[in-house]
């Protein structure tokens, strides 16, 4: 699956907000967005009034960049969400929250989703005792996610746990840091994903045009 490999900090500057794509660095004075809080490029400082379409497009781009998903897969998530019963906004959020790389990040085994994706790609993550190397794998309620025993001493995992062990876990997850495992208990409600700075309704309106 293709993925974005360019500078992460430029994405935050383009969206005009911190997306926390680099973990701990985003909270330090090394954060590029804090030093240059304007879009990259020669005209980055220019203030532009967005049209309704522009607002919708920015919402979509922001959500894609937060979860590290490119357009083809993100549209597929929308199409799946729109076919399901219930609130399409919540269905879309559930689709991206169920990604294995996202769940590894949410459990606190990685400082950001990029590192979580690498952990999955490199075979460090088990789902229900079996190795899964597909970051977009859709985790289901009741699935147990753990770090392989041979991988528990690698620095990114140990640093992430040290950073996250005293933080509250999202309410749809439970985590056991002593045993390097966690459980995806249920799908999240839209209002529970409090760190998503996106108007999801704008994305739905964009795709349904």
UniProtKB/Swiss-Prot annotation:
Pfam assignment, any one: Ribosomal_S4
Alphabetical keyword list: Ribonucleoprotein, Ribosomal protein, RNA-binding, rRNA-binding
GO cellular component annotations of the record: small ribosomal subunit
GO molecular function: rRNA binding; structural constituent of ribosome
SMART domains recorded: Ribosomal_S4 (SM01390), S4 (SM00363)
Annotated ranges, domain S4 RNA-binding: 98-164
Gene Ontology terms describing biological process: ribosomal small subunit biogenesis; translation
HAMAP family per UniProt: Ribosomal_uS4_B
Family: Belongs to the universal ribosomal protein uS4 family.
Annotated function: One of the primary rRNA binding proteins, it binds directly to 16S rRNA where it nucleates assembly of the body of the 30S subunit.
NCBIfam families (UniProt xref): PRK05327.1, rpsD_bact
Subunit annotation: Part of the 30S ribosomal subunit. Contacts protein S5. The interaction surface between S4 and S5 is involved in control of translational fidelity.
Protein name per Swiss-Prot or TrEMBL: Small ribosomal subunit protein uS4
Source organism per UniProt: Thermosipho africanus (strain TCF52B)
Lineage: Bacteria, Thermotogati, Thermotogota, Thermotogae, Thermotogales
Gene name per UniProt: rpsD
């Amino acid at each position: 699956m293709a993925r974005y490999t360019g500078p992460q900090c430029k994405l935050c500057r383009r969206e005009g907000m911190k997306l926390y794509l680099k973990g701990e660095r985003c909270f330090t004075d090394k954060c590029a967005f804090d030093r240059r809080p304007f879009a990259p490029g020669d005209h980055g400082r220019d203030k532009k009034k967005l049209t309704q379409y522009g607002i919708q497009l920015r919402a979509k781009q922001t959500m894609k960049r937060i979860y590290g998903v490119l357009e083809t897969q993100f549209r597929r998530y929308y199409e799946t969400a729109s076919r399901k019963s219930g609130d399409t906004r919540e269905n879309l959020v559930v689709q991206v929250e169920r990604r294995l790389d996202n769940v590894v990040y949410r459990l606190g085994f990685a400082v950001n989703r990029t590192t979580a994706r690498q952990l999955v790609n490199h075979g460090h993550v088990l789902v229900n005792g079996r190795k899964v190397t597909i970051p977009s794998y859709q985790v289901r309620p009741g699935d147990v996610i753990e770090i392989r025993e041979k991988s528990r001493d690698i620095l990114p995992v140990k640093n992430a746990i040290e950073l996250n062990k005293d933080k509250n876990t999202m309410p749809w997850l439970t985590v056991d840091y002593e045993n390097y495992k966690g459980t995806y208990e249920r799908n999240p409600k839209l209002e529970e994903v409090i760190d998503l700075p996106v108007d999801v309704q704008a994305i739905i309106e964009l795709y349904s045009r």
